[in-house]
Amino acid sequence: VRRQRQMCIRDRWVFAGSGRPQGKVNEATIVKNMDPEEREYLLYLSLYDGVTSLAIGVDSLSTLDQPTVDLPVREKPVVFYGTSILQGGCASRPGMAHTNILERWLNRECINLGFSGNALLDLEIAELIATVDASMFVLDFLPNATVEQMKERAEKFYSIVRSKHPDTPILFVEDPIFT
């Protein structure tokens, strides 16, 4: 599986290109020969490989600045908790992880707390999630948590989040295996 970086251009958030890593150190031209005008970009980094350093090069007459508006809107994000599927383990490229797609569609920050093989309803994670002033919480742990873990922890996990967010929607995602 090749890990990719992906860039999208704001307006309609169209796909602009991918860089395909070939080793530990990589250099890639993702966008070139564009008309000189102001644009905003989203840059998605690899879903699994870590990044220790990142440099973005631009034409000598160009500049990089902070976005002019808060896009996506960071106030009251949607918080997702779940498995490697949620993390983006099955996505063809980083921008195609469903949380990234939803972030673009909703124009709302989506916090992706997908943990490969580790959505085990750890109560410490519930405490962490509960610190976020979210517009919605999406809990998708069924593929990882055992029946015993669900019996022991699901209600407590929910209660921790609900106690700090009595009016915020909490969506439980069902595992397709059990439908």
Regions found by a protein language model. Give the residues of each.
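Alpha-helical cap/lid subdomain in secreted, periplasmic
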Residues: N118-T179
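A short linear-motif detector with a strong N-terminal bias
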Residues: V1, R20-G23, V58-D59, S116-N118, ...
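Beta-sandwich interaction modules
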Residues: F15-P36
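A broad structural signal for short, well-ordered beta-strand segments within beta-sheet-rich domains
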Residues: R10, A16, V51-A55
